[in-house]
A protein has these predicted regions:
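N-terminal "arm"/small-domain region of PLP-dependent enzymes with the aminotransferase-like
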Residues: 1-61, 68
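Conserved core of the PLP fold type I
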Residues: 53-165, 172, 177-202
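Conserved A-loop
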Residues: 41, 180, 205
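Residue-level marker for buried hydrophobic side chains located in beta-strands
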Residues: 34, 171-172
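Active-site pre-Tyr helix/loop in NAD(P)-dependent dehydrogenases
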Residues: 37, 201-204
Length: 205
């Protein structure tokens, strides 16, 4: 006996120049892609040995990566660093690691947080002020914000984290673009319970 399998819809994301070229075949070239935050001029890759591509990373390789992230982001020694396949992967995992009934997102912002928590059955609210985040089980702020660069101060986020902790809530701070203004990072806030900070190698490197 067999059962039909419904395929999971492909995640819509930026950077689909192939689709844009098909839709607008007469557009001038080269295209300037503003739909994704990936650096179009990355640092030159070193001459890696081919053996680096023939096996999965072992524990030592993960430890090296975590140490590199800790040093790059000035993460305190007492906090846990978790590496993954990009911030997008964590966005999709968060609703399952931190189930929530009500999620508040400081908007207008990156839409994948709302989509992921809605898919997990949460009520998602887009709010306009930091004060409105406090009433939710999970509060999400992209800082600096994508796409407009809005930036909440360390003082504001510290106060918000304290208020969320008093309610037993989770504050998720997405610092994917913080490499461009690193002095505003609040990665040290993760030393307290109920705060996670997401960082991205791909935006700057």
């Amino acid at each position: 006996m067999t059962a039909a399998v419904t395929p999971t819809p492909r995640l819509a994301h930026g950077g689909r120049l192939d689709a844009a070229r098909r839709r607008f075949p007469d557009a001038p070239t080269p295209w300037i892609d503003l739909s994704t935050g990936v650096n179009p001029q990355p640092y030159p890759a070193p001459d890696w040995p081919i053996t680096a591509l023939t096996r999965l990373p072992d524990d030592d390789a993960f430890a090296t990566l975590e140490m590199a992230a800790r040093l790059a982001y000035r993460a305190p020694s007492e906090i846990q660093v978790v590496c993954g396949a990009g911030v997008q992967a964590f966005i999709q995992l968060l609703p399952h690691v931190f189930p929530a009934r009500r999620v508040a997102i400081l908007g207008f912002s990156y839409a994948e947080y709302a989509a992921s928590w809605r898919n997990a059955g949460a009520e998602v609210m887009t709010v306009e002020t930091l004060d409105e985040l406090v009433d939710a089980d999970v509060a999400v702020i992209v800082n600096p914000n994508n796409p407009d660069g809005r930036l909440a101060s360390a003082q504001e986020l510290t106060a918000l984290a304290r208020r969320m902790a008093q309610r037993g809530g989770l504050l998720a701070i997405d610092e994917s673009f913080m490499d461009f203004t690193p002095q505003h990072s609040v990665v040290d806030l993760t030393a307290q319970a109920g705060v996670i900070v997401l960082r991205s190698f791909g935006k700057a490197y």
